[in-house]
Regions:
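Outer membrane beta-barrel transmembrane domains
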Residues: 234-238
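N-terminal leader/linker segments that initiate helical-solenoid repeat arrays
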Residues: 23-100, 105
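Bacterial N-terminal signal peptides
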Residues: 11-20
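Short coil/linker segments at helix-helix boundaries
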Residues: 49-68, 94-125, 131, 138-167, ...
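TPR alpha-solenoid repeat register
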Residues: 86-87, 135, 178, 217, ...
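A cross-kingdom marker for long, charged
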Residues: 239, 248-274
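N-terminal secretory signal peptides that target proteins for export/translocation
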Residues: 1-6
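Residue-level recognition of tetratricopeptide repeat
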Residues: 83-84, 132, 175, 214, ...
């Protein structure tokens, strides 16, 4: 029979082996930041609920749903045991959607407030997880919104935005949302400043191809954008007057998300004009 000290040591060794096996068995696509947030099933469900609400707001272009989604992400952050890079990112993502809504509605003061909030949360996110390239890409896109609000800053913010996209791609070259955000940015950037439909098509085609391979399991990770990649690629083809290809891509966008209002509106317009 083992002496008392020997039995304690044996028990500790067994516990260590059990713990080591459990850690080795964890899915590799679950990030450290998910565990920092508590990694609980209930928090994961809360994040998924907030994501669904945000997507509903995007589908219908409803600012109240977008604001509700943001509040839900804030609640998730408050429930987490520590700051979580993915939750911080999603708060900024909700602000990004609100900025787009406010700018399209000529509500520049509201857009300015949301921009400040989005940048604040993304700066925290990037500091918490420097390897999270997608946060850099979203920050770069936000600088485009800042230029829209303050055109006099274009000479400094324009190159800064490209720099953030370069850093994002260096960190996560196979992330489809980085290519999507870059493609949208290039689509709205005049050709003489390095943008245009052709440049946008390169990034958006890459995004579409990467989205086809992506399978997100972790509920905390970003999972948006596939239908938008098809829709903006369609917009680039439309600008090049390739209307049949544009319609084909819009139909694919609606296969991904039948409720996506922008794709439905664009497809309806093309079908009426053809």
């Amino acid at each position: 029979m083992l002496p008392e000290n020997g039995r304690i040591l044996c028990a500790l060794v067994i516990l260590f082996l059990i713990f080591s096996f459990a850690v080795a068995s964890l899915p590799r696509n679950i990030s450290t930041s998910s565990f920092q947030a508590g990694g609980s099933a209930s928090l994961g469900k809360d994040v998924q609920e907030a994501k669904a609400k945000l997507q509903a707001g995007i589908n219908t272009w409803d600012s109240e749903l977008l604001k509700t989604a943001r509040d839900l992400f804030i609640n998730c952050l408050m429930k987490s045991k520590a700051d979580n890079a993915y939750i911080l990112y999603h708060i900024a993502l909700a602000d990004y959607r609100l900025i787009a809504f406010y700018l399209s509605s000529k509500m520049n003061d509201e857009a300015e407030k949301s921009l400040i909030e989005a940048q604040k949360y993304l700066e925290k996110c990037m500091a918490l997880d420097p390897s999270f390239g997608e946060a850099n890409a979203l920050y770069g896109y936000l600088l485009g919104f800042e230029i829209a609000l303050h055109p006099e800053k274009a000479m400094t913010l324009g190159p800064a935005g490209f720099n953030y996209f370069s850093k994002a791609l260096a960190k996560e070259p196979e992330n489809p949302r980085i290519h999507l955000l870059q493609g949208i940015s290039l689509f709205y950037t005049p050709q003489e400043y390095g943008g245009g439909a052709d440049k946008a098509m390169e990034s958006l085609t890459k995004a579409v191809n990467l989205f086809e391979k992506e399978a997100i399991v972790d509920p905390f990770k970003p999972s948006w954008g596939k239908e938008e990649a098809y829709t903006y690629l369609a917009a680039a083809y439309k600008q090049k007057k390739n209307y049949e290809k544009a319609k084909e891509l819009l139909k694919k966008a609606l296969e991904v998300n039948p409720d996506f209002g922008l794709a439905r509106k664009e497809l309806s317009g093309l079908e009426k004009s053809s």
